[in-house]
Amino acid sequence: MEKNKYIYGASIQGIQGFIFSTNSLKDIVGGSELVEKICTTLFESNYLQGGTSIINAAGNIKCVYDDLQECEKTVLEFPKTVMLAAPGITISQAVVKVTEEELKTHFASCMDLLEKKLKIQRNKPARSMTVGFMGVERSRTTGLPAITQESQEYLDEGTLKKRELSIGGKATIALAEKSFGLKDLSPKNIALDIKRLTENNDWIAIIHADGNGLGQILSKFSSSMEKLKDFSEKLNQATCQAARAAFKKVYTAEDYTQDSSIFPFRPVVLGGDDMTMICKASLALDYVKVYLEEFENATRQKLGAENGLTACAGIAFIKSSYPFHYGYDLAETLCTQAKIVSKNPLIQKDAKNAPSSVMFYKVQAAS
């Protein structure tokens, strides 16, 4: 009798809303670290026993289980684990049951079915775990029920989790080390106050970059689990390589000592083909220019010249007091518009991929 396999998929939702729910940089730092932890160590250490990982980045988790009980355990327990670790984030899950032969010969079709099931689940509203009762004290920044008080500030559970992770410890700088390509960073290098990031200039930039034509390239690598896993890992490596190259090329122009300097960059998301960064406004355009160039070079190097990718970016220049979630929404919208313009036949012409491009906007209105 042929043994069955179980393809498990999870899509974590509300990531950006969770990260940018306040204008406190230390809370954004903690939020980004929490999301990074959920997608990597939290899942791997608790739910990957007996499973084989396929994709594990940027809020998407896919793996194959040999044992039904292990798969059922993940479906039952992982959402609760996520919601306890990061209150405010929701998760959609789906499972496709296949035979070993189907997994080998029709892997792409199996993954398409999994994506369809995940899409259905994402459209089902999730019950909020953070609404609370009337008459309870609430956080002044998020409006959610407070569970503790620090000095004169009431903190909800999500903010408390972010603070615990953002202040001290190796987790605070894990994403920064991955983004900068520097080892043994000190917490002193990471700004937890927006004023330390901007120095005397109150302008900051929120950058969001995303790869072009990923769906077309992905179809080439979806014929087997091994190929898709290898593609996912190499794409993630290329994105990190581009971010590191951009940081080192742009920031070497500024004098700093790793022991004491606060870097004018704060990575928020880095994985898959996505990159979100908060930085000093004067460095944003130079950083994005190098990042887009290096992303093209790195994907050609790792995926092959014929499979190289391009990317588009959006930059929102805002005052540090301007609501971060509006700034991120603007950066994401600008990135989307840059993609639309790049795909114009008059611009793309006969090129296989839309050219890399950037669109930016400076918000002049008061916060």
Mark where each language-model region is.
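Regulatory and interdomain segments flanking nucleotide-handling catalytic cores
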Residues: M1-S367
